[in-house]
Amino acid sequence: IYFDEGTIAPIEQGPISIDVSMSFLNPLLAEEFQMQMVEVDAPVEGLDDGTKKRVALTFDDGPHPQVTKQVLDSLDRYNAKATFFMLGNRVQYYPEIALDVLNRGHEVGNHTWSHPVLPKLTEAQIMNEFSTTENAIISAIGQESTVFRPPYGSTTDAINAIIPRDVAIWSIDTLDWKHRDANKLVQSVKNQMHNNAIILMHDIHQSTADGLNGVLDYLANEGYEFVTVSDIMPYVQ
């Protein structure tokens, strides 16, 4: 409440203001001057407003009998979770590695059976690629995949509509399949990094396994939390 100078105190004290709770004052006012009180929920501690630093590491085209295990060991050292988009024809040969991926707390995604360019296939062929891979994944790990990635990132709205999974592409391509250089892997991530990034790598190249510790170290020092694709997708759609 604001009082002009001299109203309730000597004039030399100037204007006087008194803080009064609206919940106390409101009932004292005439009805036409009362204000509608709106209850506001208190902030929830730890509530994510979308600005938290997070990153999703993804690995395509495995599992591989040597490289995937090295990748898993590196992820363990940083308590980092990742998503592995697996080819059905490799899951069939290495089911125990696919199961190890799941048992270490990572996400398993479907990446088709034979890595075709999906827009060149018929709908029946596309669903066969998905379903045969899904059967191999279920046989290996005892549960379905949770996400899908089209080979080469090549897809259409029509294809996405028939795949019964969330379709995840990427926002950072490390080109690890091309340069096969551990140092370039780290630099590629540094050059392109942004919040809520989905990083594409491949757990079939030794150079990727060799460079992964550097990537993890950089991201950890920058304060990023390592999450799965399913965890990050609400923030990138």
Question: Predicted segment positions?
Answer:
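Hydrophobic membrane-insertion alpha-helices, especially the h-region
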Residues: I1-D4
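N-terminal "first-domain core" detector
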Residues: A9-E12
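Active-site beta->alpha N-cap acidic-glycine motif
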Residues: S17, M22-L121, Q125-T132, A136, ...
